[in-house]
């Protein structure tokens, strides 16, 4: 972490000393929280199963209340850990795109956490709403009333003043805002800044601390003091988190980090190139259409391919960024949270690129195989299909597991904790590696599609745009003048259907 400030000066020169100090403090605090939570989660997971079992010796009148208290304690520790990992990943980043890939989960998980705790609607069905309703019936003291009222007010006020972004959350978790969304929506995630995400973090943090302080006292009063003997007999249910997995990679960490970083940098350049193309070319098409009365609607296919290339670059950056978090962490809980994030990312990539049940709406249908129609697919495209089918067949990416990791509502986060402690690091890493390797092949396939579309457009325009001869005759006498020369040459290219070449000739005029 000590190298964060110097390594990130290239793209964070505007961060002031106070922000850097906060970042360093946050990194160190995050380490402490994750180390503590590594001990806390197994403890409260076992207690939760005890208080929800038939063997529980707690008085029936208080049993349900204890279940809610322990459940919320579990939730708070799990939720805060996964969003601390996002911040730490951003602080570790050596590339702007890598930093933003981690930062987007701060907003996403604050939304998921708040939605589960209090909700944007239907507050009575939320974790906190149900707890308060039960507590008001079962309480035998007024000691905690003030604290509980303050938390309820804080949750209400947060909902009224939140600076979270629901569209960003959808993009972070699904790579689209709505079903069949445009890949260009991902450009919204490129606007994320560490200042904004830290502001979101600091806005929500007081609520978390109020709740943690309150539940320490509630647990002592309603559970640990009256049932101390029973609680001490509870045995752990979750296995110890893997520490052996890190030994597998120990000798190759530097090599792995270097390879991942190079891939992030290459895909970041690809992302920027696609971004520039998607910004400039529609304006150029419009200008040429207006100037020369030429129909360039066919060129939209070329832009759609650029959208797909942009998305594939983003997928690769996202997956590589969480791999770096995993390989650079020495905290078992953080590594396993990174593995769960890998699972979410890989699930979403497979879904968007290929689809699980069918290919409808996938990039496979829209971009990769569309030009081939009933033709035999090239070997490179068949290889993409084989890799995707193999990943689906591995049964690593189930909807239940994904929902547990993404949506923090009741029962989901209990399952998520169980999944967290039963991750298969080698399988997750091998599958992630397979996806990272196949994404450039998908990009090559899309380039092949672009060439095919470009060829079709050229043939079409060469046939139907003979009218350009009239414009050529008009400006031929002036074709050697500086600006006219470029226009004349671009018209010659346009006549042959070489539209992209014509645009490139004109764009610097």
Predicted regions and their residues:
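Long, charged low-complexity segments
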Residues: 167-174, 400-407
